[in-house]
Amino acid sequence: MEEPHSDLSIEPPLSQETFSDLWKLLPENNVLSDSLSPPMDHLLLSPEEVASWLGENPDGDGHVSAAPVSEAPTSAGPALVAPAPATSWPLSSSVPSHKPYRGSYGFEVHFLKSGTAKSVTCTYSPGLNKLFCQLAKTCPVQVWVESPPPPGTRVRALAIYKKSQHMTEVVRRCPHHERCSDSDGLAPPQHLIRVEGNLHAEYVDDRTTFRHSVVVPYEPPEVGSDCTTIHYNYMCNSSCMGGMNRRPILTIITLEDSSGKLLGRDSFEVRVCACPGRDRRTEEENFRKKGGLCPEPTPGNIKRALPTSTSSSPQPKKKPLDAEYFTLKIRGRKNFEILREINEALEFKDAQTEKEPGESRPHSSYPKSKKGQSTSCHKKLMFKREGLDSD
């Protein structure tokens, strides 16, 4: 028991003594003095040096302002709550004109003649001045000029809403189609109109009007051709929610010089749908019912109009028979017999024409074994009866 007491008298190890000495060196409240922490201000850059190093003025008023840490969450809070719809759906400050303008070069836009079959992917209605096409399908548009425009001329395609209450909104694709991986590497995902097979196409986002357009250089017609054809694609359906949302749109095609001066303008309505032929027939029929001018007929429309004309053809045959009698003097027995047979045949034909709808039903009700015999006897009896009546 005495050995432990003797151990207490032994001095602590060197490490413990060093720790205790260091602990005594600390000031009160465990705060280091200024002598132990030299100032670090000489290591910081001045505001002028920061501005010159960045090469630009972040605030735009000549000084660099420090963002307090306490204000960061307050400024970020409202940004998360407010969706800022103006940036996603901007309103244009101006509405471009869509009135046709041929200009001094006789600029016009034409389309190929097409029918209304179910298999068509693009069809144009001249009476409606409307193009019906499928999503992302080729739409050839012919550009006609009477005289060659100056070098550097460009052709621009721009889409706007047709109705006045929607004209200030920018036409763009719906969010679903914007996220689709169908980009060709040139067109931005929000652009509705694209140019197919032209590497010189330029897609423009106007910073003033926020509208989207696509510009291609004007190319003169090839040898043996009178026009230049541009192939456009429409990358969103007219019925897409969040996009056009069943609102009709117009496509404006303009001819511009190298400085952007307008040389010519033309426009047409566009409907992007799943069945262009069916929708064209429906709208043309509705247009006719409202008293509008009939559009130019197409082979498909002519074929569909034939059954209506054949169904109304039996109506002239239902005219009442002529009941007036005439007396004819004939010389010679042989001539009389010939004319009598002709007269009986004509009267039999008139009787069959008048009774044809009603007689077809009782004939079909006879048994198959006696059908041929009964009809032949019936005709002979009628023929004899008609002959007696004629005499």
From Swiss-Prot:
Which part of the chain engages DNA, per the record?
Answer: 100-290
Q: Where is the composition biased (Basic and acidic residues)?
A: 347-362
Q: Which residues carry this modification: Phosphoserine?
A: S9, S15, S20, S33, S37, S46, S181, S267, S313, S390
Which is one Gene Ontology cellular component term of this protein?
PML body
Give the sites modified to N6-lactoyllysine.
K118, K137
Motif Nuclear export signal residues?
Answer: 337-348
N6-methyllysine, modified sites: K368, K370, K380
Region ranges (Interaction with WWOX): 64-108
Molecular function GO labels: ATP-dependent DNA/DNA annealing activity; copper ion binding; DNA binding; DNA-binding transcription factor activity, RNA polymerase II-specific; molecular condensate scaffold activity; promoter-specific chromatin binding; RNA polymerase II cis-regulatory region sequence-specific DNA binding
Record remark on domains: The N-terminal and C-terminal disordered regions undergo liquid-liquid phase separation (LLPS) following homotetramerization and activation. Post-translational modifications, such as phosphorylation or lactylation affect the ability to undergo LLPS.
Oligomer status and interactors? Forms homodimers and homotetramers. Binds DNA as a homotetramer. Interacts with AXIN1. Probably part of a complex consisting of TP53, HIPK2 and AXIN1. Interacts with histone acetyltransferases EP300 and methyltransferases HRMT1L2 and CARM1, and recruits them to promoters. Interacts (via C-terminus) with TAF1; when TAF1 is part of the TFIID complex. Interacts with ING4; this interaction may be indirect. Found in a complex with CABLES1 and TP73. Interacts with HIPK1, HIPK2, and TP53INP1. Interacts with WWOX. Interacts with USP7 and SYVN1. Interacts with HSP90AB1.
Which disorder is it connected to?
p53 is found in increased amounts in a wide variety of transformed cells. p53 is frequently mutated or inactivated in many types of cancer.
Q: Output this protein's name.
A: Cellular tumor antigen p53
User: Per the UniProt entry, what species is this protein from, by scientific name?
Assistant: Cavia porcellus
Q: Which gene encodes it?
A: TP53
